Amino acid sequence: MATTKKDIRALTKKDLREFFERQGDKAYRGNQVYEWLWQKAAYSFDDMTNLSKETRHMLETHFVINNIEVSTMQRSSDGTIKNAVKLHDGLIVESVLIPTATRTTACVSSQVGCSLDCLFCATARLKRMRNLNPDEIYDQVVAIDKESKLYFKRPLSILCLWAWVNRS
């Protein structure tokens, strides 16, 4: 019977520290992995170059890193970027970056579909299917950040924290 690997980004820093201790390793390895996942946006264990190959292989044995894929991107002449984002389960959401003269706004999806019936909104025509996981919200911001060359000063960790709190 095949075992399904757990998405490592569903673990808290404390969970990661405890995992490494159970494996007979130092707890600080959990801090290193957490930093790779949430500050450096690593999508592969091989990217975690300050970990030994053995440690990376052990992580690969126990976990996966589910991530999104920008399936289509549209850029308008005013600089707006709209991404159709494919989630790890194949569902699609959208994220948009809207630059103006005074500020730049990033709109990211927090759920697939919507339970409201706003007439002006295309998403409202979709049946609400599920809330996004914190990592799926985070990945949308990372994707927008990479495309726009914007520098988001610490909002990624704040967004992640908010998403975890909201999840409970």
Tell what function each PLM region has.
Residues 1-104:
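Flexible, acidic/Gly-rich N-terminal and inter-domain linker regions that tether
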Residues 91-95, 101-110, 115-168:
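Conserved Radical SAM active-site core
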